[in-house]
Amino acid sequence: MNKMNENGRSMIEMLGVLAIIGVLSVGGFSLINKMQTSYTTNQVIDTAGDFANHITKMVREYELDTPGASNGDLMNEYLCKAKAVPDSLLEGGAACSDYKENPFSGINDVTYNVKYIGGKVSVVLQVANLTDEMCMQMVTTNWGTPGTSGFIGVSVGDEVDAVNKGEVNDAVAIVGNKTHPAPMGVGTAAKACGSNNNIVNLSFK
């Protein structure tokens, strides 16, 4: 009788151990996935930050070298020729002229496209094919102010010059027809990301 009890208890204990291992395995995989996603997201944000630094430094040169500049697509080619684009975003062997309308491609198929607009917003960096998490982290990141980094606003969606239409003196976030302070709050970001193809537009003067 005691032996049967011991065998039964041993089996129950073994099942308990297996259940714990299963829970830990699922939790471990979940943690690894979150860490990988966070790492990838940080890489995308770092790349966008480096790109933005190059853009804001080059936009005045672009205006001087391209009199009457109005076609935003031409700035992609200009940045490529000036070697102001990270090598990791360039397709091997592609000519700079190929970047007139084609965005630069990074990790996880995230793409970067530069649009020269002129006016209050001189240039916009479009970052597309973002996951919801990437989008939310990007729009809640502090990209600076008009006086420090030249950053004047962020929007999500296809309308590249949404920020250009508002009368603002400080960095703003545009969601639909509403203007919010930048960076976006988490609630605003959750509303913006996931419903507009997750294209983030970072606008600089």
Residue ranges of model-derived segments:
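Short, exposed beta-strand "edge-strand" segments with a Pro/Gly-rich flavor and a Y/T-containing core
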Residues: G8, Y62-A69, V124-N129, K178-T179
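Membrane-proximal N-terminal amphipathic helix
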Residues: S30-P67, N71
